[in-house]
């Protein structure tokens, strides 16, 4: 009697491995993207705290990263941050190849945000925004997930609802905002 596996048994094993890979790979990619965005939370919160400190000392919010009492661990300062993040100065953001953190201020509209976004991947130009003041339906100090309508290539809610478990709040300024749990 010969010992070994039959062709059918080998095909069944290959089929099972294929099914497991088809299920596991999208979940793995989702976990990687969520961890990349999660890495921006502490940076955005630190910039928010620095903005609050600046406001307490000066009575207004800063438009310049260099005037805040913080060093953002991203190397490049940009005059025009990507993803249509508003800017009021040439020192309003920091970025590397994959992420950007910006003082997303529009003093004329009295809207002041700290924004952090991904620049690459399936959720490019999506990220988190923290309003410094109440803006429409958005509450000051609460962290919101956002998808920039003009740059986001995915289905609405794909990033903020499905990946970040956000609840839709409002749309304005070319962004969909979702409240994070």
Can you describe what each PLM-predicted range is?
Residues 57-181:
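Periplasmic/extracellular, small/polar-rich flexible segments of pilin-like filament-forming proteins
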Residues 5, 28, 54-55, 61:
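Aromatic side chains
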């Amino acid at each position: 009697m010969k010992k070994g596996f039959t062709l059918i048994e080998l095909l069944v094993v290959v089929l099972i491995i294929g099914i497991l890979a088809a299920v596991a790979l999208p979940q793995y990619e989702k976990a990687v993207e969520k961890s990349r965005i999660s890495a921006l939370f502490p940076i955005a919160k630190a910039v928010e705290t620095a903005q609050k400190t600046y406001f307490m000392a000066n009575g207004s919010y800063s438009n310049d990263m260099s005037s805040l009492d913080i060093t953002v661990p991203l190397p490049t300062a940009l005059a025009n941050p990507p993803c249509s993040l508003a800017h009021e100065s040439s020192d309003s953001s920091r970025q590397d190849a994959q992420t950007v953190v910006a003082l997303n201020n529009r003093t004329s509209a009295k809207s002041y945000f700290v924004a952090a976004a991904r620049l690459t991947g399936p959720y490019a130009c999506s990220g988190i925004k923290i309003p410094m003041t109440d803006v429409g339906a958005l509450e000051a100090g609460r962290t919101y997930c956002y998808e920039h309508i003009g740059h986001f290539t995915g289905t609405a809610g794909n990033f903020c609802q499905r990946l970040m478990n956000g609840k839709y709040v409002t749309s304005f300024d070319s962004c969909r905002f979702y409240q994070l749990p």
